[in-house]
């Protein structure tokens, strides 16, 4: 298939093959549309102009933020069928807040991918934004159902101890 050929080319012959190898290890698959992921890790301070438009990760970050919020809300809704709106909102807020996403991004190795794609110093506060942009890229390439599975299996279950967060949230409930 064409998608299979693109994946093969990206993995072995692309000028970004080092980036593609690290990205593939993180994602668990080789992306066919590598340019989406290159853009996801391109910070605005290191943007380039293509056809009169600056290329950086902010638009993908916007999209990924919305998708991440939606999927986390659905996940919590299903996982805690007796949780009221306040509890579910607090839990979602704890998961998608900048500090949490920055920490997840660091644990995932997003800083390594950003270092490859940027010539500027990478700060920890950029990692959560890049994680959201990554979610946006995964969504554009693979659709909602795949992205939901990716977020639940590769982010929520792998990098968050939601049970500890639940205990903490319960202790602070009125």
Q: How should each PLM-predicted stretch be described?
A:
Residues 1-174:
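Double-stranded RNA-binding/processing signature
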């Amino acid at each position: 298939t064409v998608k299979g050929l693109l994946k093969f080319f990206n993995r072995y012959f692309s000028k970004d093959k080092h980036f593609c190898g690290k990205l593939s290890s993180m994602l668990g698959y080789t992306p066919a549309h590598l340019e989406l992921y290159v853009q996801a890790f391109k910070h605005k301070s290191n943007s380039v102009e293509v056809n009169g438009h600056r290329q950086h990760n902010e638009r993908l970050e916007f999209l990924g933020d919305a998708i991440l919020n939606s999927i986390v809300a659905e996940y919590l809704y299903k996982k805690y069928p007796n949780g009221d709106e306040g509890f579910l909102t607090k839990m979602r807020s704890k998961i998608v807040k900048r500090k949490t996403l920055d920490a997840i991004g660091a644990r995932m190795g997003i800083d390594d991918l950003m270092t490859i794609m940027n010539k500027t110093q990478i700060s920890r506060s950029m990692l959560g934004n890049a994680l959201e942009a990554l979610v946006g890229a995964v969504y554009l390439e693979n659709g909602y159902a795949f992205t939901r599975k990716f977020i639940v299996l590769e982010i929520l279950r792998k990098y968050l101890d939601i049970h500890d967060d639940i205990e903490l949230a319960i202790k602070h409930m009125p």
